[in-house]
């Protein structure tokens, strides 16, 4: 099977976000592979190990986004591709989906595209569905398990994790699959894998390389971003010899503050 895993470079989850000159700033925070995408990479590798084939990891972003591809290569992906162009700088998720779909079509003969559930920075979870729509392929979201896969018969069966329970779904291949963390436990890259990934040559595709003559403008613009105002809080400890005494004092204070 020929599988493409779409990943994103995000800031470390321990980062402190600040607002500078009306824009979000990550400061000197290290950038990492989006944690949700590790599960998509792992699942693609497991499919390859069982059915054979090739796993290509694809990312969209500046030149620095190559660093998000290297952990996936270290885990075992065969090839990494970065799609980067100054024209993509202000792309929203809808424009991003058009760019990614064009890159996937350039790769050709793709059987499956895998996404993580969402990115930890924007957390919209829309890009996978939008890419599936542009490709005209079935899209399976919130996948917690791939229960059956038939590369020859071009079919896939999955179990989706919904708020009210689980749902069994079957679709034809090629398909777009978005996974949740319950699907697997991502492997740790080996030392040799890390060394190999550090030396890997990652091609960069521009808008011309993927056949986009024009890049649509984002429908939404963020002219300025505001930091929420700081809230000063005063904590009052309710004391008492017994839980009952504390409860009475707490109720009295809430009545005084007209909370109840």
For the regions a language model picked out, list residue spans one by one:
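N-terminal glycine-rich FAD/FM-binding segment characteristic of electron-transfer flavoproteins
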Residues: 1-260
């Amino acid at each position: 099977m020929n599988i493409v895993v779409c990943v994103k470079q995000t800031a470390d989850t321990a980062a402190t976000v600040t607002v500078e000159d009306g824009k979000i700033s990550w400061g000197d925070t290290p950038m990492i592979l989006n944690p949700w995408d590790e599960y998509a990479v792992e699942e693609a590798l497991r499919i390859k190990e069982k059915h054979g084939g090739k796993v290509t990891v694809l990312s969209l972003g500046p030149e620095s986004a190559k660093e998000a591809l290297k952990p996936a290569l270290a885990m075992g992906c065969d090839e990494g591709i970065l799609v980067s162009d100054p024209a993509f700088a202000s792309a929203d998720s809808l424009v991003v989906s058009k760019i990614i779909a064009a890159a996937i079509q350039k790769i050709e003969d793709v059987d499956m595209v895998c996404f993580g559930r969402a990115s930890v920075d924007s957390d919209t979870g829309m890009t996978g569905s939008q890419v599936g729509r542009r490709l005209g392929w079935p899209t399976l979201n919130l996948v917690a398990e791939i229960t059956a896969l038939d590369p020859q018969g071009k079919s896939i069966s999955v179990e989706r994790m919904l708020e009210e329970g689980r749902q069994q779904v079957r679709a034809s291949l090629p398909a777009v699959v978005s996974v949740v963390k319950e699907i697997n436990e991502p492997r740790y890259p080996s030392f040799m894998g890390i060394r190999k990934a550090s030396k890997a040559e990652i091609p960069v595709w521009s808008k011309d390389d993927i056949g986009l003559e024009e890049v649509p403008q984002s429908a939404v613009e963020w002219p300025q971003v505001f930091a929420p105002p700081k809230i000063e809080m005063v904590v009052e400890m309710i004391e008492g010899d017994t839980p009952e005494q504390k409860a009475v004092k707490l109720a009295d204070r809430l009545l005084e503050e007209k909370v109840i």
